[in-house]
From Swiss-Prot:
Residues 28-87, 88-150 form the LIM zinc-binding domain. GO terms for cellular component: chromatin; nucleus. It comes from Homo sapiens (Human). The keyword NAD does not apply. One of its GO terms (biological process) is regulation of transcription by RNA polymerase II. Residues 230-253, 356-390 are annotated as: Disordered. CDD domains: homeodomain, LIM1_Lhx4, LIM2_Lhx3_Lhx4. This is LIM/homeobox protein Lhx4.
Amino acid sequence: MMQSATVPAEGAVKGLPEMLGVPMQQIPQCAGCNQHILDKFILKVLDRHWHSSCLKCADCQMQLADRCFSRAGSVYCKEDFFKRFGTKCTACQQGIPPTQVVRKAQDFVYHLHCFACIICNRQLATGDEFYLMEDGRLVCKEDYETAKQNDDSEAGAKRPRTTITAKQLETLKNAYKNSPKPARHVREQLSSETGLDMRVVQVWFQNRRAKEKRLKKDAGRHRWGQFYKSVKRSRGSSKQEKESSAEDCGVSDSELSFREDQILSELGHTNRIYGNVGDVTGGQLMNGSFSMDGTGQSYQDLRDGSPYGIPQSPSSISSLPSHAPLLNGLDYTVDSNLGIIAHAGQGVSQTLRAMAGGPTSDISTGSSVGYPDFPTSPGSWLDEMDHPPF
């Protein structure tokens, strides 16, 4: 079955007789002019058809025949594409073609003619010494040293202070809350928003960080100072309480010592060997020790076999006058047969003798020559003695 086709005008198909009988829907349209392409040659870029006269660079309008570059639906020549989307010069912010010779300083890239001092505009060559600023600007060594000398000479003069408005300060504070140490692109954005120089923004953040650090340090020092003051105050109050308690009692150290000596003198002789002799009303010899107060509790500090102990004798201690001080009135001598003899002094009318005698006892150690041991059984000599009544 044959299909009829509409034949286009003769002027439109002049030179293209092979297209007779082809539907118009199958003829491609140009991406540049949106018309059907009836030319002998058709250009195709990224699945899009072009007239040979419509394929041009979007920037320089030069017709593209051999090679082209596309970005976001537009086509460019090589030069314009790298100028627009390639690496940009740090000084002029223009793109750098890949075939062009460039200069590099750290991470910054420059055109040859842009690699120059910002003060004298002298183009820097290979081997020249220069200073690189933080924002990428270049200063030759001679101009930098000259500017530094001028700054040193004018250091005595007061420099004008930078005034920051309330709106600018609010913007900087909000940025500081987000990041106390912002990156370079953030500082550039803040500089453009506030209208301040980039160096001023950087110095403001540095001063802000230093202030926060100083405040934290001062707060910690203040807390420790309060702690030390409280400890010192508590120690002082405890010392005052002790002094006040001593004052309330009304007794000094000298008075207390005097009273102790007086009490000891009133009690009599308090030697460990003799026990409490001043108030003896009745005594009993128990296992080589004196009864301290007549209640039956013996003084157990004497050791068996000690040459300085009281020998175990059947004699008892006679009653002495009560409340007679013995510390200053007794004179002790040693007799080879009688043991220890106390001569009478002030307030003493009798002689204290510790008698010794009897055969060797089985409980004795025989450590002393002048003190004979007692017999084995205490009953052999205890029954013969008349004890004073208690």
